[in-house]
Amino acid sequence: MKVMASVKRICRNCKIIKRKGVVRVICSSDPRHKQRQG
């Protein structure tokens, strides 16, 4: 999980979602693409 100031999609499988007011990126193809804004 990377904590980034601005989250971006790295590949086409990345999805940007918002959980409890926190913007996150989840990826089904590569778990290393997981990010959260903070």
Swiss-Prot record:
One of its GO terms (molecular function) is structural constituent of ribosome. InterPro entries: Ribosomal_bL36, Ribosomal_bL36_sp. SUPFAM superfamilies: Ribosomal protein L36. Disulfide bonds: none annotated. It comes from the Bacteria. GO terms for biological process: translation. Keywords: Ribonucleoprotein, Ribosomal protein. One of its GO terms (cellular component) is ribonucleoprotein complex. Belongs to the bacterial ribosomal protein bL36 family. PANTHER family: 50S RIBOSOMAL PROTEIN L36, CHLOROPLASTIC, LARGE RIBOSOMAL SUBUNIT PROTEIN BL36C. This is Large ribosomal subunit protein bL36. It comes from Burkholderia multivorans (strain ATCC 17616 / 249). The gene is rpmJ.
